[in-house]
Amino acid sequence: GNMLLSGNVNHGTITSSGQNAAGILCYTANMGDDWQLNIEDCENTADISSEGNVGGIAGFTAYYKTDEAGSSFNIQNCKNSGNLSSTTTNGYIGGILAVDGFMQTQTTIDSCENSGTISFTKSWVMQENELKTENDDGEKEDASLFTLSVMGGGIVGRIGEAVMLSVDADKPDGQEINKKDALVRISNCVNTGALSYEEPQKG
């Protein structure tokens, strides 16, 4: 099957208490083998906020298939200028796409632009013992490094297992960059939006 979203524009503010929100296409999952999904010449100018994942154009995509799917997903010539925010401490924000959860699906994002800000607005509260780490002598001391469970990107917030399944992903090689048979290709995209998050706090 084929699905095309072309020339769509959203100017209305979106506020979601659910898991996902996006300016054009919120959620796509298990679309089936040999499907082609294309989003082109679409634009979001409105602010979008959610308690979960947020994408300026597309929100959450998933097709958990580990063998050849014959499917494709393309976003081309799309723009987001709306400010994107999430109150989660376990989610993703992308100026164009929040989450690419397709596994064996050829995914292309080309000639897209994000100028909206990306912000995680909920502070990450930790207990006193979680804010400490153990040094080489086994003594507890204040931690100097934290790993937040949130990810934000000017173009894409998160790319899942497709990276592992792509062209020689386990063997870094400059010659493998831009291979046409790579599962995920992002090209000619620009981000000028700022990224911010709340610092961890003691609970």
PLM segments and residue spans:
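Surface-exposed loop/turn motifs in large extracellular/passenger domains
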Residues: G1-G203
